Amino acid sequence: MSQLEDYVKTIETLKKEYREDITIFLALEMEYFPGIFEPTIEEIRQYPMDYLLLAQHFFYENESFHGTRFGWADEAHLKMYVELLTTALDTGYFNMVGHPDIMNYTGDDALYTKYMKQLADRLKQECIPIEINVNGFREGYNYPDKKFVKLGVENGNEFIVGVDAHNPDEYHDLASYKGCVKMAEDFGLSLIHI
């Protein structure tokens, strides 16, 4: 959190400098861990965030962290992931969810549909679009997951393509961006733009 104040000052300066050219939003991506959420959010609430993006890369179990992107075949971990995101959304602080389909569930398709439909329903209820993630597409990860996109389409969710650039060069990866747009178009989606 020591860099948060500098980050906010930088974004606020850039907002003023480029206000005639582009709209710049103040945003932060974070994970949700119940045991440390309150002190973390108290720090963040001091700043005028436009977007607070939930991106759950890990879950905490048996006193250790486990990556959500690594293959999980059991119902318990899938349920834990969806419940963790739902609990995070219950806080009312998050207005975006990054790669909600990051959970690499390799088990029964019916269970996947059961739990991920609950997540899609909640995102729809909160008016949070499902992200089609460019970084996952570029890296060949398990997301964006066509099963989840299809489920969201059938559920009537809105969608957005999120760049998720981890360095400035990735922002200019038009081939991966166009691949995600094509995926959306293949499902008959019209994307929202922020």
Protein language model regions, located:
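Helix C-cap/helix->beta junction micro-motif
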Residues: 18-20, 125-126, 155, 187
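A metal-dependent hydrolase metal-coordination microenvironment
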Residues: 1-76, 172
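Short acidic/histidine-rich active-site segments
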Residues: 157-172
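Domain-core and long-helix interface of multi-subunit machines
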Residues: 53-155
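Acidic-and-aromatic substrate-binding clefts and catalytic sites of carbohydrate-active enzymes
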Residues: 31-37, 105-110, 137-144, 168-176
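Residue-level marker for buried hydrophobic side chains located in beta-strands
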Residues: 26, 96, 159-161
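Conserved small/polar residues in nucleotide/adenosyl-binding loops
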Residues: 192-194
